[in-house]
Amino acid sequence: MQSRHVPPPQSDAGEDVSGRIEVARAPMPPEPAAPLPINPVLVWIIRLGAYLPNLALFGVMIAVWQFTSSVWLPRIDPQMAVLMPAPTTIVVTAAAMIMSGELLYHLVASLKREATAFVFASAAIPIGMAMGWWRPVYNQMNPIVELLRPIPPLAWIPLSILWFGLGDGQNEFIIFLGMFFPILINTIMGVRNIEPNLVRAARSLGASERRVLTRIVLKGALPQIVTGIRIALGFGWMALVAAELVGANSGLGFLINDARSMLRTDIITVGMLTIGIVGLAIDAGIRALTRRTLLWSLAMAK
C-alpha cells in the first residue's frame, strides 16, 4: 500500500504546525534596457530643421536678388544694374578683399575704436550706481543727464571735429556718447530695483556699506547693467560707422564712403554686410552673457 504525503495543517495566519511560515516571493523586476546610443548626425539634423524656415526665406531673397540684378535690371536699365550688384559679384569682391587683407584692416580699425570708446563709457557703471544708491547724487546729476541724453551723438560731430580734429579721437568721442547714456540709465534702474529685504538682511548681519554695494547691489544690478551694455554696443556700433563717414582715414565707415566716390557698389555692400555680421556677433555674445548673469542673480536671490 503506497503512502501518501499529507501537507501539515495550517492556521488561518498561514503558519503550519511545525512553525514554518510560507511567504510568497514577488517576481524580480526586469533589468532596465541599456540606453540607445545618440547619433550626433541625427541631433545635428534635428537642430538644423528648426532653422529651415529661416534658411528657406533667406534663399528665396538671395534668388530674387540674383535674378533682379543679373537678368531683369540689365534689360530694363543697364546703368541701374551696375548700381545694384548681384550676390555672386559681392561674394567675389568680398573674397578678394579678404585675401588682400583690406577688409580685415578696416574691420580691426573700427573694432579698436569701439573698444577704446567702451572703456571710457564703462565709467557710467560707477556713476550710475552712485546715482541709483544715493538720492542727493541723483538729484544733483539727473538734470544734467536729462539735458545731454536727448542730443543725438551725430549732432556732436561738428564740435568734435573742432575739439579733436579728424582722426581717432573724434570718432571715439562720438562712439562714447552713443554708449555712455544707455549704460548709465540701465545701471541706475538696476540699482533701484534691488530687493530692499536683501539690503536690510545684510546690514542686520553687520555688513559694511562697501560690502553691501559690492556683494548685494552690484551683483543684483548686474543683469540690468549687462542689458545696458548690450544696447550701448549697438548704439556705439551705429555711431561708429556714421563718425567714420565724416572724419576717418580707415574703418568700415571710411571704406563705404571711399567706395561711394568710386561708384563701387559691390564694395559698399561688402562693408554694409560686414557691419551687420559683426553687430550680430557682438549682440549674440552679449545675450549669452546676459543669460549667465541672470542665472547668477536668481541664484543669489534664493
Which positions does each model-derived feature cover?
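Transmembrane alpha-helices
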Residues: 173, 177, 209-243, 266-270, ...
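N-terminal signal-anchor/first transmembrane alpha helix
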Residues: 36-69
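Short cytoplasmic-facing helical segments at TM-TM junctions of multi-pass membrane proteins
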Residues: 143, 186-231, 252, 256
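Membrane-spanning helices that line or support transport/gating and their immediate boundary helices
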Residues: 67-75, 129, 140-143, 186, ...
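C-terminal transmembrane helix and the adjacent membrane-cytosol boundary/short C-terminal tail
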Residues: 135, 269-302
